[in-house]
């Protein structure tokens, strides 16, 4: 896979709490230069990223995060956060499921939590990726989380926040793809730093990669040609 091709899989990400305005502009410039699908930034930085990319007439989407990174805020708070991010120009929302509720077996709550965010996003033509945070889940819980995200109408399931105890694995991506089938997206994120790692995730079924190492991955793809 050539660099240009793999770039279109990448959400070029900076979710560091200390990311400055300059850091976000650099992220956007790299996304333009390398042709990444999207930038992924914290909600506070959505407006800046959207305005900057619009000024540059760039074909780069803006993704943001909801209930991040713990997923433990009430649904009403996630909905408020989602509305604000959409208002500021987000094209996609990566929301964290309520992991505790999932482990409680309160599947109605988990599903409704996702549904409410999906509803406000889809009203604005935005997509929702549901982060299940695989590092904290058993295989059964991973399967259930994917099923609930699919039932709730989400567009993608996503492995990880990158802030947990582990990131994406090929095995988890393969399992998630098997559960959601071909009609939903699967985003691999967390610890993906090389072209070889990104390619392995894509071969396992991911059709989006979340990484802060997008430049390195594309350069690696070019070197592999």
Swiss-Prot record:
Pathway: Carbohydrate degradation; 2-deoxy-D-ribose 1-phosphate degradation; D-glyceraldehyde 3-phosphate and acetaldehyde from 2-deoxy-alpha-D-ribose 1-phosphate: step 2/2. GO terms for cellular component: cytoplasm. Catalyzes a reversible aldol reaction between acetaldehyde and D-glyceraldehyde 3-phosphate to generate 2-deoxy-D-ribose 5-phosphate. It catalyses: 2-deoxy-D-ribose 5-phosphate = D-glyceraldehyde 3-phosphate + acetaldehyde. This is Deoxyribose-phosphate aldolase. InterPro entries: Aldolase_TIM, DeoC, DeoC/FbaB/LacD_aldolase, DeoC_typeI. Its main location: cytoplasm. The lineage of its organism: Archaea, Methanobacteriati, Methanobacteriota, Thermococci, Thermococcales. It comes from Thermococcus gammatolerans (strain DSM 15229 / JCM 11827 / EJ3). The active site is at 94 (proton donor/acceptor), 158 (schiff-base intermediate with acetaldehyde), 187 (proton donor/acceptor). CDD domains: DeoC. GO terms for molecular function: deoxyribose-phosphate aldolase activity. PANTHER family: DEOXYRIBOSE-PHOSPHATE ALDOLASE. Its EC number is 4.1.2.4. Keywords: Cytoplasm, Lyase, Schiff base. GO terms for biological process: 2-deoxyribose 1-phosphate catabolic process; carbohydrate catabolic process; deoxyribonucleotide catabolic process. Belongs to the DeoC/FbaB aldolase family. DeoC type 1 subfamily. It holds the Pfam family DeoC. Gene3D superfamilies: Aldolase class I. It is an enzyme of class 4 (lyase). It comes from the Archaea. The gene is deoC.
């Amino acid at each position: 896979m050539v660099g240009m091709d793999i770039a279109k899989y990448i959400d070029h990400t900076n979710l560091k709490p200390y990311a400055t305005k300059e850091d976000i502009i650099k992220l956007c410039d790299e996304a333009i230069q390398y042709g990444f699908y999207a930038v992924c930034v914290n909600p506070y930085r959505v407006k800046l990223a959207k305005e900057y990319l619009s000024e540059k007439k760039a074909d780069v989407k803006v993704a943001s995060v909801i209930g991040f990174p713990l997923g433990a805020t009430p649904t009403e708070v996630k909905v408020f956060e989602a509305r604000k991010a959409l208002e500021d120009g987000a094209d996609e929302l990566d929301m964290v499921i309520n992991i505790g509720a999932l482990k409680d077996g309160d599947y109605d709550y988990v599903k409704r939590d996702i549904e409410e965010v999906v509803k406000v996003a889809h009203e604005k033509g935005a997509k929702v990726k549901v982060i299940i945070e695989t590092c904290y889940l058993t295989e059964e819980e991973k399967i259930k989380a994917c099923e609930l995200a699919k039932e709730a109408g989400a567009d993608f399931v996503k492995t990880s926040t990158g802030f947990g105890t582990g990131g994406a694995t090929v095995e988890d991506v393969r399992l998630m793809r098997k559960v959601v089938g071909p009609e939903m997206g699967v985003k691999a994120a967390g610890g993906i730093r090389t072209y070889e790692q990104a390619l392995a995730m894509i071969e396992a079924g991911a059709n989006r990669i979340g990484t802060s190492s997008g430049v390195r991955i594309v350069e690696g793809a070019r070197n592999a040609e």
